[in-house]
Design a protein with these regions (language model features):
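Cap/insert and terminal regions of metallo-dependent hydrolase folds
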Residues: 2-95
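Core dinuclear metal-dependent hydrolase active-site scaffold
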Residues: 1-3, 99-100, 104-115
Length: 115
């Protein structure tokens, strides 16, 4: 993720919406577990760290795999921006729609670098 131009990351659930969900306790626990899904806050914190460690800053972040039961695009974006600590002008963040084709993102391959 470091020095990436574009990042696509899961932002599956809002913690309050999950907590208030009608889904059973076992399902809610699975979603939050280490083998479950990434919450909006954790996605934001992670990308905030990536941004700060990157010499070449990412220009675009797309939040993906939003839960239809425990998230909305507005929740995902608000949670992400608050947790990332980044200013809205720092990068373009969008939430991919669940049921439709979203904004087209064009990617180009740059020069190969050895790790």
């Amino acid at each position: 993720f470091i020095d990436s131009d574009a990042i696509f990351i899961e932002s599956n659930y809002n913690e309050q919406l999950l907590r208030n969900s009608t889904r059973g306790a076992m399902d809610r626990a699975r979603v939050k577990s280490g083998v479950g899904h990434l919450c909006n806050i954790d996605a934001g914190r992670f990308i905030g760290r990536v941004y700060n460690l990157s010499a070449r800053k990412p220009a675009n972040v797309t939040l993906m795999h939003l839960s239809s039961d425990h998230n909305t695009p507005d929740h995902a974006l608000a949670d992400f921006m608050q947790a990332s600590g980044l200013a809205a002008e720092a990068l373009c963040v969008r939430a991919a729609p669940r049921e439709a084709v979203g904004t087209e993102v064009r990617l180009a391959l740059g020069p190969h670098r050895r790790l």
